[in-house]
Structure formats: C-alpha cells, structure tokens
C-alpha cells in the first residue's frame, strides 16, 4: 500500500484542536492595579527637567505597531474549532517507524504473562511555550515494547528530538512504574465484594468534570468501560476517555493499598433493619452528590486545578512506592518452579522471588551501560533488574520474573534486542 512522503501531523497538533499539545497558560499571582509599595518607585524613569526649559511641555508618545495575535474560534471546551490557518501548518518528510518485529511464537509466549496495568501521565515542556500532556496505561509485565522504543516512536511522530525528549519520556515512564508496581502487582481476591467510594475530578481543557463513584475492587468492570459510557452519556469527546480512566485507576490503586493494609473505611447505616440503606441511599437530596457535574472554568483556573491535582498525585506516588509487606509467597513460587521445571528442592531454594519488592533498581549513571545478559535490552528499557544465573543485577525484569517462576530463562527472549 502506497504511503505519502510528507506529513503535517506534528504541526496540526500545535493548532489547539487537541489536548495532546497545548500552549502554556501564565497564571497571574497578583493584580496589576494593586499598590506594590515603596519599592515600585525604583522602576519609575528619571524626569529630564531640561526639556521643560526648552519649551517641550509634553512628550510626544512614540507609537510602536503591535503585532496582531492570531485569534481562533473556540468551543465550550476551550479548544480551537474550524480549519487551521496555512501559516501554522507545514509539511515534513515522513519517517519510517522503527517497530520491534517478533514472530508469532514470541507473541504467543508473551501473551501468557499476566497483564498488570499502571496509569502513566506525561507532562513534558516543549519549545516555543508548548506542553505535551498525555495519559495512558502501561503493562508492568510488558514483554516486547520498552519505554525507550515507545519514546522514540512518540518523538518521531511529534517531530521532537529523541536525544532531548526521548530520555525524559522514557525516564518518566520508568519512574511511575517503579512507584506503582508494589501495589499494582498484588492480586485481589475473587468472589468477594469490596465496595469503596471515591471522588473523581478531571480537567478536560476548560471543562471541569466532577463525580462521585461507588466501585467494587474485585469487579471485572474496567475503568475504560466506565469512561466510555460516561463520555457517551455526557457527550464528551474521545480525548476525555483516557483522562477519566486514568483518574479512576489512580483512585483504585490508592484504595487497593488501603485494602491490603486493612484501612478501608466503613460506611455507617442508621436505617431500620430490613429497609434500604447504603452510601447512595439519600432521601433528602435524592443522590445529588452521585451525579456527574460539568463546569466551564477559565484558563487560569484550569491551570490551577491541574497543578493542585499534580501535587496530590506526586504525594500519592511517594506513598505507593513505600508500600511493602505483601510480597508474593516465596515458598509457593519455589513449589511452582519445581512443578514446572522438574527441579529438585535444593535447586529451587536458590531461585529468587518474582515479587517487585525483591527487585533492584539501577542508578542513572548505570543505565546507559547496563544490558541484560539474556535478551540484551538496555538498562533504560527496564524499570528494575533482577538476579539471574550469572549473579546479581544480570537480568531485566521480564527475564528475571520468568527465571524466578520456572527456574529457566525464556528461550524466546534470547537476544531479542540485539
């Protein structure tokens, strides 16, 4: 199939029609009309009294032509509508995407691993006062795609420097995986009902979405399915779906950590036995708090809301990274390894644990030089390293987990990234 030689995708993203790349909004902290005190007199220019003696009573102001700012028509979400002007669109030669090509057998073996999804948020400062903001899910047990390859593909699509922004994107993904992994890897018991209540607050351009949700931590319902139904009911665009799903994933991970520590809140019920009761039973306001609310805010308020939420997310990530005490049962893993690999008890005793709590991290100066002894992936392509047959810190996360579970290195990953 023929493909175009040029593309305008990267420049069209900067026109304001999407939430992926947006202009930075300067948030004013004080009013210009307020009195600034005595120090403000230092900025007053000196008066030349000699000009008054020569008869120049008034200075003639010099008018400098101001450059007209381009005005875009925006919708109720604050996004530009209509066809972008030709001055902002410029074509460039399309580059071939460097994918990692694997065989069907390798894909089949990779699909056997359990998927553990972690919410990832990117917030990267770009040139010309632009900002890259994106949210997506990353499989902690991903077997083929690495943060480095993902960053290279994203930079190629957005026409960004891989050396500058590729490193920032990959390091941001690895850091968030390291912080969420201890909580995300803990499996929840099936068949039990664990109801929790949490609030959602998402900033969608100039729209502020607020909602209160009751969720079952053991439910097979995914946040993605919930976000699709919510956006369809409220008439929101497709860009709002990953934002809402990301916010739900964050809340669920936080509540999952509280559930593992036995700190889930109890909901009081003063109802008569046999009558309807629950956190959503409200006869006074008829459940007004349980309905989604959309509000249009200014750009300054939207920026403040995003900053406040980002601070809360950073605080929660620090708490999640300190989560411990719920590592996988090492004896059970050794028993499973003996059953799968037909190993003796003495051989399985030397196997490491597959839990994230037993993994190790590399220093930033070690990552560019480190490579996995089996699949040959770089240290920047894995969020943690593990012990293997050749010693400590010799395997990446994917190879190390397979070795800990089966006692054998995965044959299909041999020299995968050579």
From Swiss-Prot:
Pfam families reported in the protein's UniProt record: GATA (PF00320), SNF5 (PF04855)
Signal peptide: none
Subcellular location: Nucleus; Cytoplasm
Keyword Glycoprotein: no
Location of Phosphoserine modifications: 269
Complexes and interactors: Component of the RSC complex composed of at least arp9, arp42, rsc1, rsc4, rsc7, rsc9, rsc58, sfh1, snf21, ssr1, ssr2, ssr3 and ssr4. The complex interacts with histone and histone variant components of centromeric chromatin. Interacts with sad1.
Protein name: Chromatin structure-remodeling complex subunit sfh1
Native species: Schizosaccharomyces pombe (strain 972 / ATCC 24843)
Gene: sfh1
């Amino acid at each position: 199939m023929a493909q175009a030689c040029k593309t305008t995708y990267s420049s069209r993203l900067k026109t304001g029609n999407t939430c992926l790349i947006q202009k930075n909004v300067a948030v004013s902290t004080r009013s210009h009309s307020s009195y600034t005190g005595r120090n403000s007199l230092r900025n007053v220019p000196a008066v030349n009294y000699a000009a008054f003696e020569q008869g120049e009573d008034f200075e003639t102001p010099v008018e400098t032509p101001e450059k007209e700012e381009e005005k875009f028509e925006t919708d109720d979400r604050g996004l530009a509508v209509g066809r972008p002007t030709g001055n902002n669109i410029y074509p460039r030669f399309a580059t071939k995407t460097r994918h990692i090509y694997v065989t069907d057998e390798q894909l089949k073996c990779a699909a056997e691993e359990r998927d553990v999804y972690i919410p990832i948020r990117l917030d990267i400062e770009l040139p010309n006062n632009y900002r890259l903001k994106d949210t997506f899910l990353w499989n902690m047990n991903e077997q083929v795609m690495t943060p480095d390859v993902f960053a290279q593909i994203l930079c190629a699509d957005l026409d960004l420097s891989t050396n500058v922004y590729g490193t920032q994107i990959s390091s941001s993904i690895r850091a968030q995986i390291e912080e969420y992994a201890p909580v995300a890897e803990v499996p929840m018991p099936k068949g039990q009902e664990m109801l929790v209540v949490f609030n959602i607050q998402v900033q969608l351009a100039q729209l502020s979405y607020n909602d209160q949700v009751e969720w079952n931590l053991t439910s097979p319902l995914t946040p993605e399915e919930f976000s699709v139904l919510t956006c369809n009911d409220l008439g929101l665009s497709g860009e709002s779906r990953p934002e809402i799903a990301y916010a739900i994933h964050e809340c669920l991970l936080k509540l999952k950590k509280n559930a593992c520590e036995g700190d889930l809140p109890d909901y009081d019920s003063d109802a008569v036995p046999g009558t309807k009761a629950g956190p959503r039973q409200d006869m006074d306001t008829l459940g007004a708090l349980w309905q989604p609310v959309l509000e249009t805010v200014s750009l300054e308020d939207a920026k403040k809301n995003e900053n406040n939420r980002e601070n809360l997310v950073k605080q929660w990530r620090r708490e999640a990274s300190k989560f411990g005490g719920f590592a996988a049962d090492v004896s059970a893993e050794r028993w499973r390894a003996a059953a799968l690999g037909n190993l003796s008890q003495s051989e399985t005793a030397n196997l490491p644990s597959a839990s994230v709590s037993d993994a190790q991290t590399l220093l930033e100066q070690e990552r560019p030089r480190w490579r996995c002894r089996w699949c040959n992936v770089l240290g920047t392509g894995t969020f943690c390293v593990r012990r293997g047959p050749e010693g400590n810190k010799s395997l990446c996360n994917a190879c190390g987990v397979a070795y800990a579970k089966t006692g054998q290195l995965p044959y299909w990953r041999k020299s995968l990234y050579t």
